[in-house]
Amino acid sequence: MLKKSIHTMIITMISRVLGLFRGTLVAYFFGASVLTDAYYSAFKISNFFRQLLGEGALGNTFIPLYHKKKKEEGEERSKEYIFSVLNITFLFSFLVSVLMIIFSSYIIDFIVVGFSDELKIVASRLLKIMSFYFLFISLSGMMGSILNNFGYFAIPASTSIFFNLSIIFSAMWLRKYFDIDALAYGVLIGGILQFLVVFFPFLKLLKTYSLKIDFKDVYIKLLGIKLIPMLIGVFARQINTIVDQFFASFLVAGSITALENASRVYLLPVGVFGVTISNVLFPSISKAAANNDKEGTNRSLVSALNFLNFLTIPSLFVLTFFSKDVIKLIFSYGKFNEEAVKITAECLLYYSLGLLFYVGVQLVSKAYYAMGDNKRPAKFSITAIIMNIVLNYLFIKNFQHKGLALATSISSGVNFFLLLFIYVKNYVKLDLKNLIFTTIKITISSVIATGAAYYINNVILKLMIFSIVFLLQWAYPIYKYRERVFYKK
């Protein structure tokens, strides 16, 4: 797991760094303005639908059913199942994309109530341009899940590189001709590129394709039944961002942009560590669950959580204690002024408090899906979203943008602990003692590294000192025990 995770993390890291550079360019050319608020609002809506199918519910529901069908009915029938699901995905995504174009103005009116009428028109136009991004990214995400299942992790992980390059190109060159619309065209082109990157390896893997949909297949019906609670869960998690936008639309201009830029920074470790390790681990947990191998599931999950903590806890300390330094380093160029730095750094600090929880939810949710339990993650996500809405309402008056970020962190923490403890109670008795002890050791190492770097003024040197001091404390244990440093029996 560790070797595959590291290879995929390197690719994902490249993609996420390009994503930060993309954000830097948008900040440089457009600053934190009403136009960027309109762009990020429209993008969040199209991206929200992408999260439902593109990299979430559908793939996680499909993979366990695919393994079961292959075991019961053989290779050929399982291939036909893949084609049926992909064809249904195409039809559904196409319909949703068309509906987004038709009803774009109504969607914008509903989501960002606080925008002026002129700004709503801009956001509606941008959403129309980006609508078909959902079609391409849904197909890309589904094909990527299938490639992951066959052990091809690098290709799906690389798709976001092309997406980021598309928006970078659009910001640098198309901006001259289309202004803020250039970013929307970049999103659409990026979606097409992501689809093409996985489409050809997918065809090479399966060697054929069929446009047939077998609606009589009991596994198609079973997929629909299991998908509903999964969709509710993913919907609830993603609605957090939409809820934040709704409240932020009533704040000063640039607040939505600040939340978006801050979330992109804290989502760097979530994407690089949480999503990567979860995707690599999911097929093996699914197989262990199918064989009722509880010890194997315990070992895989605890070692993965420890490995995630090793990567995430130091990231949490950096983003919390050095938030302003990090934002200055990434965004403080061109039209991105000192006030924009200040509010973005404040958002980052409060988002980062929940970093461990965001990452943990990614992994533990996969453990539920491997067990065929799609309902509990959905219920816990709904609980978290209700808490997030209530906390947003309570915090926004006194804490403005900071309150929105803090509410997201708290609700994510509730979601994570519900997932973890109910999983331990109902499925596998995880070695929580090992997990807690390792977490304490990593936290102590992070405190020492923070103390060593805190008073250094140069931000790059500060981050280097932090990294060196932290890694030196773990160099010998990792050298001696290798993977076993994260789970020793």
Where are each of the predicted segments found?
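Membrane-embedded alpha-helical bundles of multi-pass transporters/translocases
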Residues: M1-K489
